Amino acid sequence: MAIKKYIANADNTISNAWQSNLTRRATGSNMGAADVLETYSVYARAYTSSAENKQVELSRILIKFPVDDITSDRSSGIIPASGNVNFYLKLYNAETSKTVPERYTLTVQPVSQSWQEGTGLDLENYLDYTVGNTGSDWVQRTKDDAGAILNWVNAGGDYLTASNYDQLFEGGLENMEVDVTILMEEWIGGVYSNYGFGIALSASQEITASYNLTGAATSYYTKRFFGRGTQYYFKRPAIEARWDSRIKDDRGNTFYSSSLSTASENLNTLYLYNYVRGGLTNIPDVGTGLLKVSVYSGSIDNSAPSGSKMTLVQDDTYVTADSVEYATAGYVSTGIYSCSFAVTASKTPPTRMFDVWYSGSNRYFTGSFKPQTLEASQISLRPTYYINISNLKQSYRSDENARFNLFVREKNWSPTIYTKANGLVETETIESASYRVYRQIDALEAISYG
């Protein structure tokens, strides 16, 4: 699983709450530079007349992400094409001494007009006023280059109500994690303009008013998330792009075809990695095209391919009836090609085989592998493995792409050798594993399992 985070590039809290004197509202206040974002709904705290809208106190979140960066990364191949990647909106709960509601739903909707972040900080008394300055609030959305003030059509923000995402908060303190893949793809594809997300309580839990007759007659106060200006690096609001980037290369764990396995399980998948001056590069004469892979037994000392091409098992995908002496290899990504095939063991099967990758008369690569024979067992095997990262460092740069080398062995393996000393201990190959990344000093989980 690959994860790439895109941190928010603008956020703000807008509110129409009463200030502490209960005589003036915060509709002109801006909180764009605050390190916390807040949403709530308060019922009848300042009921001063029969006008029902004076009962309403609301706070909503505006947040925007760099979709242009995501589009650029897709064009350069950093993230996959549409359909092969999911996007998740991640916001992290901010601890507070204030009350927190339970069993409420937050709704995420795309904002339909542009807005400015602003420089206000005051989330308590709402004293940082926009009042004609740059920034958005409950009424104003932006100030243009000519100095003109542009307001929302609807106080509290304008949203595309046809596209919304909900998350239920049972205990109230949960983080937000919402799959927003469909909307992100629409932004990337230009179906809608990217004006960010609006986050608020669901319509049934925001206070009842003339414009929301099905609203609640109770309070939900308050839910806070860390904003993009927070000092906590791992708790900044982000869009997470997630995709399956696994390359399961069977070169170190190949098997002869067996009736104990299904046809798909009998396939061994091998890869070719074309590194040129330290970087993966397509083979010039092949590009994104196809290669052929033939398998040979070894010479007497098993140091090189020898003899004729071996007959592979026909699967009608990689090996066809007309080409049982080679498997068709395909393009995976820049500089990486793969092929899959099954091979049947002879009465005295070779202990080492060689795979030759070629196109026409050009040979590009010769590799080797040691196939194993699959056997049934009279006992149930559930091995436990010990894993060591052999190249782990104390620290890494934030812009570093680190590759970890794992040494794997079974728990009950004994290194004691009585008959012959051997300085090379071979690692085990495991088919699947999960990992998480957490900070040791406080157990903060940066990446969870799965």
Predicted regions and their residues:
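Short, compositionally biased P/S/T/A/G/V-rich stretches that sit at domain boundaries
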Residues: 243-263, 275-278, 363-418
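Contiguous segments within soluble domain cores/interaction surfaces
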Residues: 291-295, 299, 305-306, 379-381, ...
